[in-house]
């Protein structure tokens, strides 16, 4: 009897328990046109995307899985998958601002490109999730983002009546005098697209086969937009419009889209 007792206790000690990610729906308006279904592993959001069509996004809260399990578009009464297995990716490059030699935050020529800087990849832990309604906007906030001295969350905002959605790393730091440059995009362990398309600065459309390789190719594009094309549809990616832009003597397309 004693031997079986100890064996049973040993088995309990090694029994794996799957971590569940809590989903907070307290600030979600269930009368919203955006419909939400949630479990410990998935959040499914369906919303009107204009012209009588519906869009659907499935988020995977499991730690080792891509965040965006699938993106779907309803056309002709049936769902078509645009892409699957996508992960938002952000790189933050931070450097020191010179707030002493001239006019504090009003300084214009502190030459940050010649000062020490470090690039961090934003890491996601998927600690918790919350869905909230703000008028015709619905925000999904996933806590547990970290990049160097920055901490925060990932926020996805859906817009009723549009296929547009915004993905943002909302982060802050207590470190003073920090300049920030960021890269943002979507990655996948497989190739979700058949082609990658863009318009050049003259407005001519281009597309190339999507291939898997170790290096990205920077191109000069119009509207800072690239398009992933699949059998089920296309997804256009572009950064949010500038809310503030410093005065420029010249303006150049530096081919920063990749």
Q: What annotation goes with each model-predicted range?
A:
Residues 52, 65-66, 135-137, 147-151, ...:
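Coil-to-beta-strand transition motifs
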């Amino acid at each position: 009897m004693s031997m079986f007792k100890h064996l049973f206790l040993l088995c309990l000690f090694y029994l794996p328990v799957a971590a569940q990610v809590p989903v907070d729906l307290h600030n979600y308006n269930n009368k919203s046109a955006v419909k939400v279904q949630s479990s410990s592993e998935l959040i499914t959001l369906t919303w009107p995307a204009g012209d009588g069509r519906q869009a659907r996004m499935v988020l995977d809260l499991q730690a080792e899985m891509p965040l965006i399990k699938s993106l779907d578009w309803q056309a002709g009464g049936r769902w078509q998958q645009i892409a699957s297995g996508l992960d938002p990716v952000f790189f933050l490059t931070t450097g020191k601002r010179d707030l002493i030699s001239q006019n504090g935050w009003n300084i214009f020529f502190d030459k940050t490109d010649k000062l020490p800087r470090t690039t961090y990849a934003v890491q996601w832990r998927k600690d918790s999730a919350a869905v909230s309604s703000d008028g015709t906007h619905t925000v999904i906030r996933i806590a547990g983002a970290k990049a160097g001295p920055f901490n925060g969350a990932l926020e996805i905002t859906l817009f009723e009546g549009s296929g547009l959605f915004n993905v943002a790393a909302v982060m802050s730091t207590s470190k003073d005098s920090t300049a920030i440059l960021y890269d943002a995009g979507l990655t996948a362990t497989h190739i979700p697209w058949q082609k990658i398309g863009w318009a050049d600065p003259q407005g001519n459309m281009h597309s190339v086969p999507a291939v898997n390789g170790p290096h990205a190719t920077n191109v000069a594009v119009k509207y800072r937009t690239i398009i992933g094309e699949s059998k089920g549809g296309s997804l256009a990616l572009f950064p949010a419009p500038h809310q503030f832009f410093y005065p420029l003597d010249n303006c150049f397309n530096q081919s920063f889209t990749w």
